[in-house]
Amino acid sequence: MWNTVKMKWDRPTVLMADIANLSGQFSVWYSGNWAKRFHVSQWNQEGDSLSWSIESGFSGKVNVTALIKGDGAEVQLSTGHSIAKNRTGEQKLTKTISTNWNRVDLGIIHLKAGINTVTLSSSRPGGGLELYSLELVSPDIRLCLEKQAVEMRSDTSWMRESKYGLQFHWTSESQPRYGKQKVYADAVRDFDVQSFAQMVNQTGAGYIILTTSHAEHYFPAPIKSIDAIMPGRTSDRDLVQDLIGALEACGIRLMLYYHVGHDHWVEPDGWWTRTGFAPDNPNVFISNWCAIMTEIGERYGEGLAGWFYDDGCVYYPLNPDFRQLGQAAKAGNSSRVICYNPWIWPRFTDFQDYFCGEGYSFLKSHEWLPGDGSGIFTDGPHKSLQAHTNFILEKSWCHSTPEIPIPPPQIPKGEFLQDMVNAIERGIVPSVNLEIYQNGSCSDISTDYMRAIKTTLT
């Protein structure tokens, strides 16, 4: 996919590794619909290289940052008239958290006005290199964006004060314990918010993250901007508002998990097609996304404490204006916290507030965190973000198999309690995912785990 990329003047220009001209025996993993984008791996041979064609409207210096994984490797970035070098191993940035992916500053190169060829090569790949992307931005714009990101960042102290939260993948795929699954709108109508809030309150959780859409895109409230894209994906009942009220009465905040719905890509006229997603022309998709976020944010105001945006690898390759996305995400509540899940990669933007931390291992990863429990990464791939993790307690994110009970926790209780206490003391905020039946109830064994952590911390 050897296309010319136009330099952005107002943000970093993203050069994805998977669209580079590859010279060597690289391995590239492509998704079926080009929604989720992945890294290039098996960079093991001297002389292997990746090249991009860039059209610049100006002549001047640009900072180059690599989202890269390496072990004692040396890379060279060349435009033919300047070279930036950096040993990823010497900076020891490959050991951050539980992954050695990081954002590595490669230095400054000079671009001429017009077409440039930028090549990243390695004279010593060391233990092997993997590359997700390069980012090119002028030094002045870089400083301006860093300042704006700090100004937009929300206070996350309430998350640390909450100590921990719960996550629930309650979606169109959720199944009852027994019997036939209800259609989504009926399940929304019948959800018992008072019983649910009482259960959450007993666990001691200070907030919940409710998954509004996962594999399938639905939303449990009457949202016009969603209906405008595709009718039949919302509900008459505003379950989100009802949950805000019931949880607020218990001193519990509500956050929402959001998935853009790319799993619908196989449907010829389905949700994904109608969103306007197009990797080479993302304006319609981003406009639709911003409209949805703005409407939801203004509808719930301060009642909506945060967003958890899954699949950052869908957003980032579109090279969006993350400041614009952040403004939409915080519509109605400038203090709302947001994150873009980077999976194994480093942070995709500074225009966010907390690190996703998908997986139990992040509960035990304290690198780059100060010992005072303040919980903000001082360096590394998630620098300046609030430490957070979300993980599965039982078997799955969502209870989507009919006629079976929720399985018991996969983690021994003693180990779970100790890991939770250690993480919370370090300032990490855990969101524990509990499987949930369609009627809004959970496993007694799992909720007992959570009541135990409440008792332990009291």
Residue ranges and their predicted role:
Residues 2-458:
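Mature catalytic domains of secreted/periplasmic carbohydrate-active enzymes
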